[in-house]
Amino acid sequence: MRAKTVINDLIFKVMQKFDLKDVCFFDCETTGVPAKGLKWDADFKQFPHVVQLAWSLGDKEKSYIIKPDNYEIPPETTAIHGITTERAIAEGVPFAEVVDEFLADANAAPLVCAHNIYFDSSMLKANVLRYCGREYYDAHVEDALHKGKRIDTMMKTIKFVGALYSNGRPGKYPKLEELYSKLFPGETFPAHDALEDIRALRRCVPELVNLGIIELAQKEYPAEQLKAQFEPEKPKGGRNIEFHDPNPVTEPIGTGEPVPEPTPEPERPAVPLNSKTRELLNENDF
């Protein structure tokens, strides 16, 4: 146990703690999920589009449908979130206008929180590069969404909610509906509306804090882990994101997907951070 603490101390330091009013909750609905192997920085033109973006900060709530820019919303994703191409054209606001307002609030907030934050932040980053350009990205996105501010309720609740293998290891990434049902038995909410999702998430977080599963605190990472390098990367296989965890999980692609059962490995002593460990840390954009 002490070895794990030492390693984590080297990875980041927990900074000042905050209250719920200091958290910017956000969620987006999209035209789909990225094809396997695509990277938001190198392959942003091939990423799906954002269909709806909602967020809250303190008493403020915002929700916008995005006006399509020469693309169609596939029927299979409309079946999930209910937003058609026709509705988005009639009611939508250009992505650049919406994301500018969101990033102003996210930048002002000490913490940002989402369920599967890697997916939502990657979708936003890719679409910022597509519609706003790299100069805008550099000026606005890194500070607003940097990993030291992030809270990911999906990754934090895998063991709390997820179905388990026979050996006790986590079997899947929990959907927000599953987390909500676990915390509030018998209750539901209208999932896959971005605004309703953040309302549900905002209700879950205080319960998770009380259970000791998450804390409302910033983390300080080495500077080299916080900036995107915008260099194409070769696709890599599953990567362990919990160092020296007896029940490791692999990096998510989408909410609710099964986690491949890892091959048991012998106990290994803790080692100081080396170049390979730093490389793994740098790849995991959480």
Residue ranges and their predicted role:
Residues 44, 88, 92, 191:
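Flexible, glycine- and charge-enriched loops at secondary-structure boundaries
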Residues 16, 21-22, 36, 45-83, ...:
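Metal-dependent phosphoesterase core characteristic of DEDDh/y 3'-5' exonuclease domains
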Residues 229, 261, 266, 283-286:
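N-terminal intrinsically disordered, compositionally biased regulatory/targeting segments
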Residues 80-102:
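Metal-dependent phosphoesterase signature
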Residues 245-273:
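Acidic, proline-/serine-/threonine-rich low-complexity intrinsically disordered repeat tracts
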Residues 3, 239-246, 270-286:
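Short linear clamp-binding motif
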Residues 12-13, 40-43:
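Short secondary-structure capping/turn segments at boundaries of alpha-helices and beta-strands
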Residues 1-28, 32-35:
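N-terminal accessory regions of nucleic-acid-interacting proteins
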